[in-house]
Amino acid sequence: MTYVILPLEMKKGRGYVYQLEYHLIWCVKYRHQVLVGEVADGLKDILRDIAAQNGLEVITMEVMPDHVHLLLSATPQQAIPDFVKALKGASARRMFVAYPQLKEKLWGGNLWNPSYCILTVSENTRAQIQKYIESQHDKE
């Protein structure tokens, strides 16, 4: 796949223009490798749904056995801690309902480690970050 650096699209709100993209990473509690097969696919669907409900745009995503990478776009009104909480909290609740076997490995009731990493993305770094996220499974 060829990646070309393109100017990022400016989005418009009422009285402002913006371009906010983030690379968000978080891990499964205790780094247990439980996000595989249909569980990983289900998580992708759940995260896309939660993102849409919260006005976030998922640009690309990769679910690894013990962590998640998201490249997403947000609006200036969306506080980072709020949308991270929405993504992690709602996804954990929905995953435990959809895949009750997760509770066997994650006996404490938490799917996610409480911490996360978030990085800003610019038009100079977007293609590189997108390539990095999409190539995660190649590294296994």
From Swiss-Prot:
SUPFAM superfamilies: Transposase IS200-like (SSF143422). It comes from the Bacteria. Keywords: DNA recombination, DNA-binding, Endonuclease, Hydrolase, Magnesium, Metal-binding, Nuclease, Stress response, Transposable element, Transposition. Induction: Transposition of this element is induced approximately 100-fold by 10 kGy gamma irradiation and approximately 50-fold by 600 J/m(2) of UV irradiation, both of which damage DNA. It rarely transposes without irradiation. Both excision and insertion of ISDra2 are increased by irradiation, transposition occurs in irradiated cells, probably triggered by single-stranded DNA formed during genome reassembly, and is not due to specific induction of TnpA expression. The active site is at Y132 (nucleophile). Homodimer. It comes from Deinococcus radiodurans (strain ATCC 13939 / DSM 20539 / JCM 16871 / CCUG 27074 / LMG 4051 / NBRC 15346 / NCIMB 9279 / VKM B-1422 / R1). InterPro entries: Transposase_17, Transposase_17_sf. Mg(2+), Mn(2+) and Cd(2+) support DNA cleavage whereas Ca(2+) and Zn(2+) do not. Belongs to the IS200/IS605 insertion sequence (IS) element family, formerly called IS8301. This element is subject to strain polymorphism; in the ATCC 13939 / R1 strain genome sequenced by White there are 7 complete and 1 incomplete IS200/IS605 elements. Another R1 strain has only 1 copy of this element. Another group found 2 copies of this element in untreated R1 strains. GO terms for molecular function: DNA binding; endonuclease activity; metal ion binding; transposase activity. This is ISDra2 transposase TnpA. A transposase that is part of insertion sequence (IS) element ISDra2, it is necessary and sufficient for both transposon excision and insertion of ISDra2. This protein alone can be provided in trans and allows transposition of an empty IS element (tnpA or tnpA-tnpB replaced by a selectable marker). ISDra2 binds subterminal imperfect palindromes at the left (LE) and right (RE) ends of the element and cleaves only the 'top strand' which is circularized and subsequently reinserted into the DNA target. This is called a 'peel and paste' mechanism and increases the copy number of the IS. Disruption phenotype: When tested in an R1 strain with only a single IS200 element (DR_1651 and DR_1652), required for transposition of the IS element; single tnpA or double tnpA-tnpB deletions leads to loss of transposition. Residues 127-133 are annotated as: Mobile alpha helix. GO terms for biological process: DNA transposition. Its cofactor is Mg(2+). Both the excision and insertion steps are inhibited by TnpB.
